[in-house]
């Protein structure tokens, strides 16, 4: 999301203003800050990756060199101002909307809302899973980041969508992708946030409908949701990580339980999540 920041700053002489989580995290490679055995689901996710994906992974030297250059440049950028929810900068108002990434913000200007990757037309942003920082990382983070639950996870992302919905219907979104696609503009309003929430509700519906009174596991659940063509090679990991985010949310709402061996079972009626989501889509409930 910030791949051209160093070039832009150099060419424009502009300052970098970013969400307050950006500066303390930017010196780390994102996939190296997570303790991979921090939960039963993430432990299972990485076991499957090690057994079924990594043995067939073919290194891409050019891509790795590009990534290395990016991380080195990012670590050296200076953040001139930390942005927090509710800050006002002239006519702009800052809204913190984590979930797709911890540092995602939206900018309100008149009756427009610049949503970045938080709300997109046509496609749905990938939600983060819950974060458990590695101990060596955690001890160097500011106090407000010690509990990352406010900034990571599907529940956090859905809450951020609900936050936008509370603004009311009179905003037009200006997203980072797909505003103009296939020779046409995709003008959309706040209703798009509701559509994305409903998309995730339908995924949760499918997962629980397939579970019923049976037990399952992460890989079985993933293969039951995604068609085979979308699970080839490294795509399996991306799909499983998205399913992990949904399972974490269902565990938080008390609709499933995760056993010590990674087995997944439905709890009660398995409908608590629907009440939670209904209140996000309609704040007046």
Regions found by a protein language model. Give the residues of each.
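Active-site HxH/HxHxD metal-binding segment of metal-dependent hydrolases
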Residues: 1-87, 119-121, 190-192
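Short amphipathic alpha-helical segments and helix-helix/interface helices
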Residues: 5-9, 161, 247
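C-terminal regulatory/interaction regions
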Residues: 205-285
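Histidine-centered divalent metal-coordination motifs
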Residues: 1, 19, 98-100, 177, ...
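Generic beta-strand structural signal
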Residues: 88, 108, 258-260
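Aromatic/hydrophobic pocket-lining residues that form the small-molecule binding cavity
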Residues: 2, 157, 243
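Metallo-beta-lactamase
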Residues: 91-198, 204
């Amino acid at each position: 999301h910030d791949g051209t920041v160093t070039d832009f700053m150099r060419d424009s002489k502009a300052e970098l203003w970013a969400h307050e989580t950006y500066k303390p995290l930017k010196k780390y490679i994102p996939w190296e800050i997570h303790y991979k055995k921090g939960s039963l689901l993430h432990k299972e996710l990485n076991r499957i990756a090690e057994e079924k994906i990594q043995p067939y992974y073919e290194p891409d030297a050019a891509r790795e060199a590009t990534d290395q250059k990016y991380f080195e440049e990012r670590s050296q950028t200076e953040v001139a101002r930390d942005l927090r929810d509710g800050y006002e900068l002239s006519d702009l108002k800052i809204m913190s909307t984590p979930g797709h990434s911890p540092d995602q913000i939206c900018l309100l200007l008149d009756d427009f809302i610049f949503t970045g990757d938080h709300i997109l037309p046509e496609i749905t942003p990938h939600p983060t899973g819950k974060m458990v920082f590695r101990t060596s990382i955690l001890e160097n983070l500011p106090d407000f980041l010690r509990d990352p639950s406010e900034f990571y996870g599907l529940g956090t992302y859905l809450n951020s969508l609900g936050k936008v919905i509370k603004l009311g219907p009179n905003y037009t979104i200006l997203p980072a992708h797909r505003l103009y696609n296939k020779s046409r503009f995709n003008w959309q309003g706040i209703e798009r946030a509701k559509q994305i929430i409903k998309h995730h509700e339908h995924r949760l519906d499918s997962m629980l409908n397939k579970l019923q009174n049976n037990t399952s596991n992460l890989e079985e659940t993933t293969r039951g949701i995604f068609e085979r063509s979308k699970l080839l090679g490294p795509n399996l990991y991306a799909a499983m990580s998205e399913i992990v985010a949904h399972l974490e949310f269902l565990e938080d709402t008390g609709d499933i339980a995760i056993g010590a061996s990674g087995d997944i079972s439905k709890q009660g009626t398995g409908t608590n999540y629907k009440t939670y989501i209904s209140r996000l889509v309609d704040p007046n409930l």
